[in-house]
């Protein structure tokens, strides 16, 4: 949803009801909990399955469901809020404006009350005694939230009841509603107890997860799959830039850059900038929501006389929590990266211009700095450093007040790389976006550039840590393993990049000094040659940790790894993870061109199968990164990666049209056979990295010997006019990359209606109103350019007809008079 999603897994060792809503027994003793944690996954599965078959006396009184709190309304006639339907209608309006902020929590039902529990701390947030719940209702398929549980509660101290709305995904709202209603009925003293039967019905209705496979879950790939081999070679920039060797091939590359290449680079940078602005806006909204909740909580505490927690204060307390420090750090890094991109794009973007966006960014930057209590946290964010162009651009653009804020953030925001000690390790910045988007890979080759080299350094810097993890995994591979993946994921490192000046340079350089002995047991070349396989999900599966993937019934999934009982698959959104193979049906491979394309970074450069360690007088060894530079290798002709389509122009920041050549060209493919490694010998992870470094360097060196052209991609352009239908408007909005809220809100208008809206009206309808207005302005200008010449010709034709008619009436053709007009 649009709230902060917790990755904390309920697991089988705690309360089984936390996953699929089955009843759990009262809290165990310490000894019981320790014994339960040691119980095998298969036994726990059998225990869960037996809940539905047990006698009435064995059904527990406590059930728990993971839900998302959507909002709470006060039922007041003055606000036209009387029924649940009124609340759903207002929820739709908030959702259309992007103002619904969800909060994950556990809803617990027992024989006395309905409680809301914090997922992380397990503290009770709210407690609604059953006698205070006046109405319980399930609302399905009413809006984008398709399974809503509505609770109307009124405590004796309240003058008006509250309407609480929850989204229920894991267990549907109608089942939870039946559980609550049966508990309310039983609490009123009915002769026949309804709740045991209701819990039994829930257990039968919820499919749960399939029986566990007998074999252990497959060991997930480590860093090699998180950051592919191609992107890992990017770490070269960190050392080559220090040695002054990076700028030479880059300068030559820029001289050889064609208009098509330049357009692709600009479009890529603009897309990255747009996603940075979106993430910053989302974070600011999150801060504002927390501030609003804190303000409301403070008002309630001041107005009430007793210290007893009032209704709704528990949820408010949870919503008033500020984001964790890591999210603040990520936001500061995106500010710095955004400034760098604006400096690069200052002569390529308009409406708004780069200068306007700089002023725009300083306002939320000031808010975030104040929210952290001062510039201390921001000044500790070292990576990414601002470039010299960025510093010059900010000095020229920033106002006095903005410059004061900028300078207060310290050296990490002011000094460029050349001003830092050469031995100071500056961790490369790898942007991570909230929606999982990754920048598209450019469809041409050239010398390594900063954009191409983000992700490698992260992988290489963590290579030593990965080697230790792999060794640890191998030592325990044949020991007793759970039939399910562990609740906290697999044994690979998901640690983020190092930041700040605290990173030890010696540790950072250590992966370059030693080659791990462990060899990676994965043949990626063989995998790449196999046709893609697809499977359809037979029913829903809910992921319990970050390594698994939640799927819905009838989802079509691409099979990435089917060598074990748990298969690694990728869904239509590009998310990948592990699911049990017994919930999947193998499908016939779709026809060519059907199905989704690979994510941009899943394409890897073809590996040169050269034997690393080849030494000769005319082929010196490839340079290894710091501390000691090495001779430059003789260029080897590289293979050409698969072309990737040029990304479309982003929606919210437009760029000036640059002239480009339509002449087709061809990539000169140089081929050469290399010595291959023995088949029975697999390269270690570090050897693969070094091979890719060697190959990437040869790509940059051989650029001077080759001139190539990239053929212009024929991308269909979607435009709208005043005569466009609502369907055409909707297609145009989707082609510009607007989110579903914007598409659904504006997709009902025709072209004339859409063009008639101003910026304020668009902002009131959808959160991306300003971006839509910019695109509409571009469309209007294009229409004026295309229609201007035809309108002029029409005017001249009518004028000539009048002149001809007047001349024929007088018997004289007055050409001079006509020309004077």
UniProtKB/Swiss-Prot annotation:
PANTHER family: EPIDERMAL GROWTH FACTOR RECEPTOR KINASE SUBSTRATE 8, EPIDERMAL GROWTH FACTOR RECEPTOR KINASE SUBSTRATE EPS8-RELATED PROTEIN. It comes from the Eukaryota. Expressed in neuronal cell body and neurites, and prominently enriched in the axonal growth cone. Expressed at the tips of cochlear hair cells stereocilia. Changing residue 693 to D: Abolishes barbed-end actin-binding without affecting actin bundling activity. GO terms for biological process: actin crosslink formation; actin cytoskeleton organization; actin filament bundle assembly; actin polymerization-dependent cell motility; adult locomotory behavior; barbed-end actin filament capping; behavioral response to ethanol; cellular response to leukemia inhibitory factor. The gene is Eps8. Residues 464-476, 670-683 have a biased composition (Basic and acidic residues). Residues 64-194 form the PTB domain. Residues 299-309 have a biased composition (Basic residues). Residues 1-39, 204-224, 295-320, 461-525, 610-683, 800-821 are annotated as: Disordered. SMART domains: PTB, SH3. The effector region is required for activating the Rac-specific guanine nucleotide exchange factor (GEF) activity. It mediates both barbed-end actin capping and actin bundling activities. The capping activity is mediated by an amphipathic helix that binds within the hydrophobic pocket at the barbed ends of actin blocking further addition of actin monomers, while the bundling activity is mediated by a compact 4 helix bundle, which contacts 3 actin subunits along the filament. Residues 765-784 are annotated as: Helix bundle 4. Residues 679-697 are annotated as: Amphipathic helix. Residues 1-10, 17-28 have a biased composition (Polar residues). Keywords: Actin-binding, Cell membrane, Cell projection, Cytoplasm, Membrane, Phosphoprotein, SH3 domain, Synapse, Synaptosome, Ubl conjugation. The keyword Phosphoprotein applies. The modification Phosphoserine is found at residues 58, 475, 624, 658, 661, 684, 810, 814. Changing residue 706 to A: Impairs both actin capping and bundling activities. This is Epidermal growth factor receptor kinase substrate 8. Homodimer. Part of a complex consisting of ABI1, EPS8 and SOS1. Interacts with BAIAP2. Interacts with SHB and LANCL1. Interacts with EGFR; mediates EPS8 phosphorylation. Interacts with MYO15A and WHRN. The keyword Thylakoid does not apply. It is found in: Cytoplasm, Cell cortex; Cell projection, Ruffle membrane; Cell projection, Growth cone; Cell projection, Stereocilium. The lineage of its organism: Eukaryota, Metazoa, Chordata, Craniata, Vertebrata.
């Amino acid at each position: 949803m649009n709230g902060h999603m917790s990755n904390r897994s309920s697991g089988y060792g705690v309360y089984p009801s936390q996953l699929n809503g089955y009843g759990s027994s009262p809290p165990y003793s310490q000894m019981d909990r320790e014994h339960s944690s040691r119980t095998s996954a298969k036994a726990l599965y059998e225990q869960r399955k037996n809940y539905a078959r047990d006698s009435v006396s064995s059904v527990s009184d406590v059930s728990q469901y993971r839900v998302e709190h959507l909002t709470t309304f006060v039922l007041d006639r003055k606000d036209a809020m009387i029924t649940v339907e009124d609340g759903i209608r207002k929820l739709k309006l908030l959702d259309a404006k992007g103002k619904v902020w969800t909060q994950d929590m556990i809803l617990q039902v027992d024989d006395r009350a309905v409680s809301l529990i914090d997922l992380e701390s397990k503290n009770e947030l709210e407690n609604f005694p059953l006698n205070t719940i006046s109405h319980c209702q399930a609302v399905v398929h009413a809006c984008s939230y398709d399974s809503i549980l509505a609770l109307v509660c009124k405590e004796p101290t309240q003058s008006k009841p509250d309407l609480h709305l929850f989204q229920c995904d894991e267990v549907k709202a109608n089942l939870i509603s039946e559980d609550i209603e049966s508990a309310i009925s039983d609490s009123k003293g009915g002769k026949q107890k309804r709740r045991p039967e209701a819990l039994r019905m829930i257990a039968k209705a919820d499919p749960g997860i399939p029986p566990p496979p007998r074999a252990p879950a497959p060991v997930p790939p480590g860093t090699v799959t998180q950051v592919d081999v191609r992107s890992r070679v990017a770490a070269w920039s960190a050392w080559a830039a220090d040695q002054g060797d990076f700028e030479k091939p880059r300068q030559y590359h820029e001289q050889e850059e064609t208009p098509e290449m330049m357009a692709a680079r600009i479009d890529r940078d603009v897309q990255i900038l747009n996603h940075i602005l979106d993430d910053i806006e989302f974070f600011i909204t999150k801060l504002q929501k927390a501030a609003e909740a804190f303000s409301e909580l403070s008002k309630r505490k001041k107005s009430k006389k007793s210290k007893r927690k009032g209704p709704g204060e528990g949820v408010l307390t949870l919503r008033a929590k500020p984001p964790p420090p890591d999210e603040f750090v990520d936001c500061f890094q995106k500010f710095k990266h955004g400034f760098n991109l604006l400096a690069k794009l200052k002569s390529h973007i308009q409406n708004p211009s780069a200068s306007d966006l700089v002023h725009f960014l300083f306002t939320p930057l000031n808010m975030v700095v104040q929210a952290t209590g001062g510039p201390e946290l921001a000044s500790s964010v070292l990576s990414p450093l601002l470039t010299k162009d960025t510093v010059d651009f900010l000095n020229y653009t920033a106002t006095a007040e903005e410059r004061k804020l900028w300078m207060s953030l310290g050296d990490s925001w002011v000094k460029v790389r050349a001003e830092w000690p050469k031995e100071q390790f500056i961790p490369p910045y790898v942007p991570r976006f909230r929606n999982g988007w990754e920048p598209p890979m450019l469809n041409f080759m050239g010398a390594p550039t900063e954009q191409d080299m983000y992700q490698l350094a992260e992988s290489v810097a963590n290579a030593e840590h990965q080697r230790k993890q792999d060794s640890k995994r191998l030592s325990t591979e044949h020991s007793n393993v759970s039939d399910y993946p562990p609740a906290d994921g697999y044994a690979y490192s998901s640690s983020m990049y190092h930041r700040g000046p605290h990173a030890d340079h010696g540790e950072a350089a250590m992966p370059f000094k030693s080659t791990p002995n462990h060899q990676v047991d994965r043949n990626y070349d063989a995998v790449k040659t196999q046709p893609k396989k697809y499977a359809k999900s037979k029913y829903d599966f809910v992921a319990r940790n970050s390594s698994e993937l939640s799927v819905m019934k009838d989802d079509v999934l691409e099979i990435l790894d089917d060598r074990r009982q748990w298969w690694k698959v990728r869904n239509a959104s590009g998310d990948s993870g592990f699911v049990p193979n017994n919930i999947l049906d193998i499908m016939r491979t779709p026809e060519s061109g059907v199905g989704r394309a690979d994510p941009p970074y899943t394409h890897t450069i073809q590996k040169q199968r050269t034997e690393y360690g080849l030494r000769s007088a005319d082929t010196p060894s490839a340079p290894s990164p710091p501390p000691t530079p090495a001779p430059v290798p003789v260029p080897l002709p590289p293979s050409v990666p698969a072309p990737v389509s040029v990304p479309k122009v982003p929606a919210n920041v437009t760029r000036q049209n640059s002239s480009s050549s339509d002449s087709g060209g061809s990539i000169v493919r140089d081929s050469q056979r290399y010595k291959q490694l023995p088949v029975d010998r697999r390269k270690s992870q570090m050897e693969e990295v070094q091979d890719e470094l060697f190959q990437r360097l040869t790509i940059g060196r051989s650029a001077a010997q080759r001139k190539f052209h990239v053929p212009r991609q024929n991308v269909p352009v979607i435009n709208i006019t005043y005569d466009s239908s609502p369907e055409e408007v909707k297609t145009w909005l989707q082609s510009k990359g607007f989110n579903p809220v914007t598409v659904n809100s504006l997709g009902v208008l025709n072209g004339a209606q859409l063009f008639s809206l101003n910026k304020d009206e668009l902002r009131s309808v959808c959160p991306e109103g300003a971006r839509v207005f910019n695109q509409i302005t571009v469309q209007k200008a294009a229409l004026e350019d295309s229609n201007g010449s035809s309108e002029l010709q029409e005017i001249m034709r009518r004028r000539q007809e009048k002149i001809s008619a007047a001349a024929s009436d007088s018997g004289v053709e007055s050409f001079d008079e006509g020309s004077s007009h």
